[in-house]
Amino acid sequence: MLKVAIVGASGYTGVELLRLLHCHPEVAITCVTSEQSAGKAISEVFPTLRSRYNLVLENLEPVRIADRADFIFTALPHKAAMEVVPTFLKLGKRVVDLSADYRLRDAKEYEAWYEPHMNPTLLEQSVYGLPELRREKIAGADLVANPGCYPTSVILGLAPLLKKKLIDPATIIADSKSGVSGAGRSAKVDNLYCEVNDGFKAYGVGGAHRHIPEIEQELSLLAGKQLKISFTPHLVPMDRGILSTIYATPTGAVSSAELLELYRAYYQGEAFVRILPEGSFPSTSHVRGSNFCDIGLAVDNRTGRVVVVSAIDNLIKGASGQAVQNMNIMNGFPENLGLEALALFP
């Protein structure tokens, strides 16, 4: 059994890791941490875990944690992760980090969007953990940077088109809508019920969202040249889910049927990417609670644009599920272990 620690277990991504790994036949959770809730039973913080976990949340002490775990998930805010990840690596532990701290390759880019990086050499060593694009590198990595939720939905939606150079990269527009859990579990006025319910708003408008450099970094690698995109996220009054609608101008004549054939071939054999039939488009309700990314496609012949729609659960394929998928790859387990749950519907 692989002994696993979850550092930062009292947030939404932490409890989703616990839920998913409870059904994993090769994993034993040996340690969970939370600075705010140390000393409390995890089932007290999350009643959904009653009678399934007897763990008590601990303070973050890397050496003590490493003594009891072979593998570490860090589900901490940015900056907090980079303070502890190097210690775990020095102690010989493999890590999947769910924060933004190791996703960007360029330390100057990280500083521009966040703050100065404390260990920039690790940016070059970490592997961006999108399994459908980086499976072989993930398998041999000691540190995997789990992708962000918006980037996962946009990158998977665009990868085949950019790889085959079927769209003009300069024309990409991504319009994404997310449930409120994407903002995390800490109290914020903007996320209160009365602020969110019956409303629908854009934020991070005008190229201000921190996921933009991550999206552009990975799309540029696919395109083989540097690109910039127009990306606008929106907050919708639902618990979870991301729906991204992506627009681009094709480089030549292409039909919806041809696009579907391309996407089916590109993602053939991928357990968690589902390409929908022509004329069918994703809904967040069809991936809720699952590790699937559903993708639908169309060509708008009137405007001459390609339209791609992708849907994921921001807490699963956009966070904890993808982290478990990466852990499976890193440890030679079947990729779908612990991730076979179907979507919750209705």
Curated annotation (Swiss-Prot):
Keywords: Amino-acid biosynthesis, Arginine biosynthesis, Cytoplasm, NADP, Oxidoreductase
Single GO MF descriptor: NAD binding
Pathway noted in the entry: Amino-acid biosynthesis; L-arginine biosynthesis; N(2)-acetyl-L-ornithine from L-glutamate: step 3/4
Organism: Geotalea uraniireducens (strain Rf4)
Residues annotated as the enzyme's active site: 149
Gene3D superfamilies: Dihydrodipicolinate Reductase, domain 2 (3.30.360.10), NAD(P)-binding Rossmann-like Domain (3.40.50.720)
Principal location class: cytoplasm
InterPro entries cross-referenced by the UniProt entry: AGPR_AS, AGPR_type-1, NAD(P)-bd_dom_sf, NAGSA_dehydrogenase, Semialdehyde_DH_NAD-bd
Family label: Belongs to the NAGSA dehydrogenase family. Type 1 subfamily.
Function, in words: Catalyzes the NADPH-dependent reduction of N-acetyl-5-glutamyl phosphate to yield N-acetyl-L-glutamate 5-semialdehyde.
Protein name listed in UniProt: N-acetyl-gamma-glutamyl-phosphate reductase
